[in-house]
A protein has these predicted regions:
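Short loop/turn elements that form and flank the Walker-type P-loop nucleotide-binding site
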Residues: 60-61, 87-88, 125-127, 157-160
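Hydrophobic positions in the central parallel beta-sheet of the AAA+
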Residues: 66, 93, 130-132, 163
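Conserved motor-coupling elements within RecA-like helicase/translocase cores
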Residues: 120-130
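Walker A/P-loop
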Residues: 46, 50, 60-85
């Protein structure tokens, strides 16, 4: 409205699966202890109230965007969302740079999730969750079009039911 735009978006996709995600509470991951590499080593992973609220909001309305402050624990929330979709398929998490790939991978591993990465020289397939960069996806798309890849973008996205974008503004 501030810029005189009126946008109407309609979702015309025909879903074959009805998603019924189990909501989280603060103790959803309390059976998992933080590892030695985490400042809270040896204590249970517990979600904060606002994290529970945000995660459950995404689970109720999976096609949404939320602005979440720095330091709010976005990566643990992302891992929680990925864990909740596991019964339906794979998740892809897109981050803007390699350091966020490795940080996100570490947090997923802390949550005992089956995680692989796709960027640079590390191209790991066959995992329930994949962390990648925009650049890696763009290269994969370009190479798919040029038929110069071992795996196509279509094969890469097979069984993906959730795409989570971190730092979407970048």
């Amino acid at each position: 409205e501030n810029f005189n735009y009126d946008i109407d978006i309609q979702d015309n996709r025909d879903y074959q699966t009805v998603f019924k995600f189990e909501p989280v509470d603060e103790d959803a991951y309390a059976d998992i202890m933080w590892p030695k590499t985490h400042p809270a080593v040896g204590t249970p992973i517990k979600l904060r109230d606002y994290q529970v609220e945000i995660i459950n909001s995404f689970l109720e309305n999976p096609q949404c965007i939320q602005e979440i402050a720095t330091g709010a624990g976005k990566t643990i929330m992302t891992a929680s969302l990925s864990e909740r979709v596991e019964n339906y398929g794979r998740s892809i998490v897109i981050v803007p740079n390699k350091s966020l790939v490795t940080q996100t991978e570490a947090d997923y591993a802390n949550m005992q999730l089956d995680v692989g990465v796709f960027y640079g020289d590390r191209k790991e397939f066959g995992h329930k969750h994949t962390i990648c960069t925009w650049q890696s996806l763009n290269v994969l798309l370009k190479n798919t079009k040029n038929q110069t890849v071992d795996i196509t973008i279509h094969e890469f996205l097979e069984d993906v039911v959730a795409v989570i974008v971190d730092e979407v503004h970048m």
